[in-house]
Amino acid sequence: MNKLQQRIASLLKSLNQGIYEKENETALALLAALAGESILLLGPPGVAKSMVARCLKHAFVEAQSFEYLMSRFSTPDEIFGPVSISKLKTDDQYVRVTDGYLPSADVVFLDEIWKAGPAIQNSLLTVLNEKLFRNGHTEEHLPLKLLVAASNELPAKGEGLEALWDRFLIRVICHNIENEETFQQMLVDETIGFADGGAKSEPLSEAITDLEYTLWQKESRNLPLTNDVLLAISSIRQKVQHVQMADLELPRNIYISDRRWKHIIRLLKMSAYIHGCKSVEAPLLLPLFHCLWNEPDEIPHVQRIVIEAIFSPVAVSYTHLTLP
């Protein structure tokens, strides 16, 4: 394990204090943040989705956070900040006061994301895709490192939510604690972790600076993809377009946009960078299935496709071995 891997592992251990059986979600959220992507946590109320989001603030030095519970009546003012009355009166400019709201935050948590109205959705598309917010006549570059969205349901069909859904590169289904001993430990644990607002006076020693964040992204994007990885990705892409579901006569086409594939590559490059690899290698493709499903019933099929694409070439190479 290289030094960066050790540091990230230590950071994740600290962040997960007081959170149970959410190590996978926290690790994926941190990977999304480092790659400049966003994550959607899908699951019923009370499964620690918000705790995962809150702890991520402490992964970064002096990070600011913003969280909001969406409703059908939420307004852009509540998310992006109120309109400055003084600017409107003196300069005749429609400018928002963004301090303390989403445009000023490093880590954002939006609960019940699909309840956002069209005006909020449109602004979020630009925020997620370009890290920009149009404030009056000015485009503001946002400090945003991670946006975590949560919901207990999939986006409704026919309501124009497809574009926003596509912006969340990683999608994870969250569950209640499954291990009985872990559940009992959670019941008696009175430790206040970062996710409960128990932030220590001193920042975590492993926390990531803005300079490191920028440098890691720049260096990771220079990593090449091996030919095996390109072949595996092509195989996965072709197979997800023809997935045979048990209850359907015709294969299902799991739609993955070209833009999504491009962002997936950035995610894989960051994973390779953290692992100290000189290039993106086939074993690092395993988390891909978190990026390639649109309906929960597709997950096991996508998992199988990804695993086959990674390990089939290895199996084939073994068949050509000759005994001494």
Where are these regions (language model features)?
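C-terminal engagement/docking regions of AAA+ P-loop ATPases
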Residues: 246-253, 273-321
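Conserved C-terminal "switch" segment of AAA+ ATPases
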Residues: 174-248, 277
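Short glycine-rich substrate-engagement loop in P-loop NTPases that contacts/grips substrate
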Residues: 75-102
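Walker A/P-loop
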Residues: 34-71
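Pre-Walker A (pre-P-loop) alpha-helix and adjacent loop at the N terminus of AAA/AAA+ ATPase modules
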Residues: 5-38
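Walker B catalytic acidic pair
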Residues: 111-112, 123
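Conserved Walker
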Residues: 20, 42-45, 68-69, 89-99, ...
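Canonical AAA+ ATPase core
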Residues: 86-88, 115-120, 128-204
